[in-house]
């Protein structure tokens, strides 16, 4: 009997880590202030100190970002690393966009979604009966 020990895939709080603020805006960690706060900056968000409890770490890291980088440096490196495209391609971003789209549906559009789901369910049941 053998067992394999696999290391956990942690998201470390590190300079250059891209974070999600309020499930909306992306920013990157520029400086670690203390155990509970970091300094963040990004193209769509103002440079600010924020508690780690109010952000979510993403798997994306901005490579070779110096500690305490200024806004211009962060913006240049952000564009060079194409962070927005990486985020848009991630499943997490797609899920958030889908959630936002669903919340914007009108009553009739929700009805149409329900009808389409019923049709899809019926088609799968019909295929299972034939098999």
Swiss-Prot record:
Compartments it resides in: Cytoplasm
MF GO annotations: RNA binding; structural constituent of ribosome
GO process annotations (BP): ribosomal large subunit biogenesis; translation
Pfam family membership, one: Ribosomal_L14e
Chief location category: cytoplasm
Ribosomal protein among keywords: yes
Record SUPFAM superfamilies: Translation proteins SH3-like domain
Key word DNA damage present: no
Keywords, comma-separated and alphabetical: Cytoplasm, Ribonucleoprotein, Ribosomal protein
Coiled coil start-end: none
InterPro entries: Rib_uL2_dom2, Ribosomal_eL14, Ribosomal_eL14_dom, Translation_prot_SH3-like_sf
A single Gene Ontology CC term: cytosolic large ribosomal subunit
Family named by the database record: Belongs to the eukaryotic ribosomal protein eL14 family.
Assembly information from the UniProt record: Component of the large ribosomal subunit. Mature ribosomes consist of a small (40S) and a large (60S) subunit. The 40S subunit contains about 32 different proteins and 1 molecule of RNA (18S). The 60S subunit contains 45 different proteins and 3 molecules of RNA (25S, 5.8S and 5S).
Function of the molecule: Component of the ribosome, a large ribonucleoprotein complex responsible for the synthesis of proteins in the cell. The small ribosomal subunit (SSU) binds messenger RNAs (mRNAs) and translates the encoded message by selecting cognate aminoacyl-transfer RNA (tRNA) molecules. The large subunit (LSU) contains the ribosomal catalytic site termed the peptidyl transferase center (PTC), which catalyzes the formation of peptide bonds, thereby polymerizing the amino acids delivered by tRNAs into a polypeptide chain.
Protein name: Large ribosomal subunit protein eL14
Organism: Candida albicans (strain SC5314 / ATCC MYA-2876)
